Amino acid sequence: PARQVANGVVDSFIHVVEQYLTYPVNAKVQDAFSEGLMRVIHEEGLKVLDNPNDYDIRANLMWAATNALNVWIGQGVPQDWSSHRMGYALTAQFGLDHAQTLAILLPGVMTYMFKEKQVKLARMGEVVFGITDGTEEERARKAIVACEDFFRRMGLKTRLGECGIAEKDLDALAAPVDKQGWKLGEHHNIDSRMAREIMALRL
């Protein structure tokens, strides 16, 4: 089904992002692997919904998805799985598809933690989305817009309000972060207060 294909594309893309989009540690091999995977998933993902029976598109996506979470690209690099952890509450409390929660939350994490992620965001914008104009900060901000646009083109929503979730729901959605004792993000500093603020950016 198209919905599951879109979910798989977006989930695979974000698996790579969360192992890549932190801060530079001169891990050139892992960065190159991740950038190549994101580029392939982006390019082939945009084709697959219109060409669901194209074997080559499917094969490239399946191989990219396999490499998105087979631990290779995460070796020796900081990782940020905060979108995943926060997304669990959206699925548990509102029944949203896993990939749908990620498409909503990741742009919020990128925006909220912008200073920490600016260098890698700008690099991602250049090599994945072809963004070359502007300062590093401008390219980094354009990369966030490009990511959200990609998710929308895949047919996913990118705002909590589109899923019937309002500000009154945010306390309950953010509470599991502290309840589970999680300290999220590459710096292990995102608590429930910060999680709520990230979610508020996505209303």
Features from the language model and the residues they span:
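A short secondary-structure junction signal
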Residues: A2-R3, I73, R193
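Active-site segments that bind and position negatively charged phosphate/pyrophosphate groups
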Residues: Q19-A146
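Short runs of predominantly hydrophobic/aromatic residues within well-ordered alpha helices
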Residues: A6-V10, R58, L102, L170, ...
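A glycine/threonine-rich phosphate-anchoring loop and its flanking beta-alpha core
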Residues: P1-N26, R123
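C-terminal charged capping/lid subdomain of soluble metabolic enzymes
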Residues: L121, I131-L203
